[in-house]
Protein backbone atom coordinates (compact mmCIF):
# COMPACT_ATOMS: atom_id res chain seq x y z
CA UNK A 1 0.00 0.00 0.00
CA UNK A 2 1.32 3.44 -0.93
CA UNK A 3 1.90 5.98 1.81
CA UNK A 4 -0.03 9.24 1.76
CA UNK A 5 3.19 11.07 0.85
CA UNK A 6 3.79 8.71 -2.09
CA UNK A 7 0.24 9.23 -3.35
CA UNK A 8 0.60 12.99 -2.91
CA UNK A 9 3.78 12.95 -4.99
CA UNK A 10 2.24 10.77 -7.68
CA UNK A 11 -0.98 12.77 -7.98
CA UNK A 12 0.60 16.21 -7.67
CA UNK A 13 3.62 15.58 -9.84
CA UNK A 14 5.75 17.10 -7.04
CA UNK A 15 8.36 14.98 -5.26
CA UNK A 16 8.63 15.15 -1.49
CA UNK A 17 12.06 16.78 -1.91
CA UNK A 18 10.51 19.51 -4.07
CA UNK A 19 7.55 19.90 -1.71
CA UNK A 20 9.71 20.31 1.36
CA UNK A 21 12.27 22.60 -0.26
CA UNK A 22 10.36 25.30 1.64
CA UNK A 23 12.44 24.18 4.62
CA UNK A 24 15.72 25.19 2.95
CA UNK A 25 15.03 28.88 3.57
CA UNK A 26 13.13 30.51 6.40
CA UNK A 27 10.38 31.98 4.24
CA UNK A 28 8.83 33.75 7.21
CA UNK A 29 12.04 35.70 7.85
CA UNK A 30 12.47 36.34 4.14
CA UNK A 31 8.90 37.47 3.39
CA UNK A 32 7.54 38.72 6.71
CA UNK A 33 4.17 38.41 8.42
CA UNK A 34 2.37 41.00 6.30
CA UNK A 35 3.18 39.13 3.09
CA UNK A 36 1.52 35.98 4.45
CA UNK A 37 -1.51 38.00 5.58
CA UNK A 38 -1.70 39.57 2.11
CA UNK A 39 -1.40 36.18 0.39
CA UNK A 40 -4.18 34.62 2.46
CA UNK A 41 -6.41 37.66 2.06
CA UNK A 42 -5.85 37.64 -1.70
CA UNK A 43 -6.55 33.89 -1.81
CA UNK A 44 -9.79 34.00 0.18
CA UNK A 45 -11.06 37.07 -1.65
CA UNK A 46 -10.79 34.95 -4.81
CA UNK A 47 -12.43 31.93 -3.19
CA UNK A 48 -15.38 33.86 -1.76
CA UNK A 49 -15.86 35.71 -5.07
CA UNK A 50 -15.61 32.55 -7.22
CA UNK A 51 -18.59 32.72 -9.56
CA UNK A 52 -17.17 30.31 -12.16
CA UNK A 53 -17.25 27.31 -9.83
CA UNK A 54 -19.96 27.99 -7.26
CA UNK A 55 -19.66 24.42 -5.92
CA UNK A 56 -16.17 25.35 -4.73
CA UNK A 57 -17.26 28.59 -3.09
CA UNK A 58 -20.07 26.67 -1.35
CA UNK A 59 -17.48 24.55 0.49
CA UNK A 60 -16.64 27.68 2.48
CA UNK A 61 -20.23 28.84 3.02
CA UNK A 62 -20.22 28.04 6.74
CA UNK A 63 -16.86 29.70 7.38
CA UNK A 64 -16.31 33.36 8.10
CA UNK A 65 -13.84 34.77 5.61
CA UNK A 66 -11.86 36.62 8.30
CA UNK A 67 -11.41 33.39 10.28
CA UNK A 68 -10.39 31.45 7.16
CA UNK A 69 -7.79 34.10 6.35
CA UNK A 70 -6.40 34.05 9.89
CA UNK A 71 -6.29 30.24 10.05
CA UNK A 72 -4.46 30.04 6.74
CA UNK A 73 -1.85 32.74 7.30
CA UNK A 74 -1.15 31.50 10.83
CA UNK A 75 -0.60 27.99 9.48
CA UNK A 76 1.62 29.27 6.66
CA UNK A 77 3.67 31.41 9.07
CA UNK A 78 4.14 28.46 11.40
CA UNK A 79 4.97 25.98 8.62
CA UNK A 80 7.36 28.33 6.85
CA UNK A 81 9.64 29.21 9.74
CA UNK A 82 7.72 31.67 11.89
CA UNK A 83 6.26 31.47 15.37
CA UNK A 84 3.68 28.73 16.11
CA UNK A 85 0.71 31.10 15.78
CA UNK A 86 -1.69 28.44 14.52
CA UNK A 87 -0.84 25.87 17.20
CA UNK A 88 -1.02 28.46 19.97
CA UNK A 89 -4.56 29.39 18.98
CA UNK A 90 -5.98 26.18 17.49
CA UNK A 91 -3.74 23.29 18.57
CA UNK A 92 -1.87 20.89 16.31
CA UNK A 93 -2.56 21.59 12.62
CA UNK A 94 -3.62 17.96 11.91
CA UNK A 95 -4.47 18.93 8.33
CA UNK A 96 -6.29 15.74 7.33
CA UNK A 97 -8.48 15.83 10.43
CA UNK A 98 -9.25 19.54 10.12
CA UNK A 99 -10.29 19.08 6.49
CA UNK A 100 -12.35 15.94 7.15
CA UNK A 101 -15.74 17.72 7.06
CA UNK A 102 -15.03 19.05 3.56
CA UNK A 103 -15.06 17.30 0.17
CA UNK A 104 -11.32 17.11 -0.43
CA UNK A 105 -11.44 15.74 -3.97
CA UNK A 106 -9.06 15.99 -6.91
CA UNK A 107 -11.39 18.60 -8.41
CA UNK A 108 -11.45 20.65 -5.20
CA UNK A 109 -7.66 20.44 -4.90
CA UNK A 110 -7.27 21.74 -8.44
CA UNK A 111 -9.64 24.64 -7.80
CA UNK A 112 -7.87 25.49 -4.53
CA UNK A 113 -4.54 25.43 -6.36
CA UNK A 114 -5.95 27.60 -9.16
CA UNK A 115 -6.87 30.31 -6.66
CA UNK A 116 -3.57 29.95 -4.78
CA UNK A 117 -1.51 30.29 -7.95
CA UNK A 118 -3.40 33.49 -8.83
CA UNK A 119 -2.96 34.77 -5.27
CA UNK A 120 0.78 34.05 -5.35
CA UNK A 121 1.14 35.71 -8.74
CA UNK A 122 -0.60 38.89 -7.60
CA UNK A 123 0.80 39.23 -4.08
CA UNK A 124 3.68 41.72 -4.09
CA UNK A 125 6.89 40.96 -2.24
CA UNK A 126 7.02 37.23 -3.03
CA UNK A 127 10.05 36.52 -5.21
CA UNK A 128 9.89 33.93 -7.99
CA UNK A 129 11.99 31.32 -6.16
CA UNK A 130 9.75 31.54 -3.09
CA UNK A 131 6.63 31.29 -5.28
CA UNK A 132 7.93 28.09 -6.87
CA UNK A 133 8.83 26.55 -3.51
CA UNK A 134 5.51 27.55 -1.98
CA UNK A 135 3.46 26.30 -4.93
CA UNK A 136 5.28 22.96 -4.88
CA UNK A 137 4.48 22.66 -1.17
CA UNK A 138 0.84 23.67 -1.74
CA UNK A 139 0.38 21.26 -4.67
CA UNK A 140 1.88 18.33 -2.75
CA UNK A 141 -0.07 19.16 0.40
CA UNK A 142 -3.35 19.51 -1.50
CA UNK A 143 -2.94 15.98 -2.83
CA UNK A 144 -1.79 14.73 0.57
CA UNK A 145 -5.20 15.87 1.82
CA UNK A 146 -6.92 14.18 -1.14
CA UNK A 147 -5.07 10.94 -0.29
CA UNK A 148 -6.16 11.30 3.34
CA UNK A 149 -9.74 11.83 2.22
CA UNK A 150 -9.50 8.70 0.09
CA UNK A 151 -8.76 6.66 3.21
CA UNK A 152 -12.20 7.49 4.57
CA UNK A 153 -13.98 7.32 1.18
CA UNK A 154 -11.97 4.86 -0.95
CA UNK A 155 -14.58 4.55 -3.72
CA UNK A 156 -15.19 8.25 -4.36
CA UNK A 157 -11.86 9.39 -5.82
CA UNK A 158 -11.14 9.97 -9.48
CA UNK A 159 -7.45 10.19 -10.44
CA UNK A 160 -6.29 13.69 -11.21
CA UNK A 161 -4.93 14.91 -14.51
CA UNK A 162 -1.48 15.46 -12.96
CA UNK A 163 -0.97 11.84 -11.89
CA UNK A 164 2.49 11.01 -13.17
CA UNK A 165 2.43 8.45 -15.95
CA UNK A 166 -1.16 7.42 -15.34
CA UNK A 167 -3.96 7.02 -17.84
CA UNK A 168 -6.86 8.97 -16.36
CA UNK A 169 -9.51 7.88 -18.80
Curated annotation (Swiss-Prot):
Record's keyword terms, sorted: Heme, Iron, Metal-binding, Nodulation, Oxygen transport, Transport
Pfam families linked to this entry: Bac_globin (PF01152)
Molecular function terms, GO-annotated: heme binding; metal ion binding; oxygen binding; oxygen carrier activity
GO terms classed as biological process: nodulation; response to nitric oxide
Description of what induces expression: Down-regulated by nitric oxide (NO), particularly during nodulation mediated by Sinorhizobium meliloti inoculation.
Binding site for heme b: 99
Biological function: Hemoglobin-like protein that exhibits an unusual concentration-independent binding of O(2) and CO. Required for general plant development and during nodulation. May promote shoot organogenesis from root explants.
Family: Belongs to the truncated hemoglobin family. Group II subfamily.
Subunit structure: Homodimer when ferric.
Name of the molecule in the record: Group 2 truncated hemoglobin 3-2
Source organism per UniProt: Medicago truncatula (Barrel medic)
Lineage of origin: Eukaryota, Viridiplantae, Streptophyta, Embryophyta, Tracheophyta
Protein's gene: GLB3-2
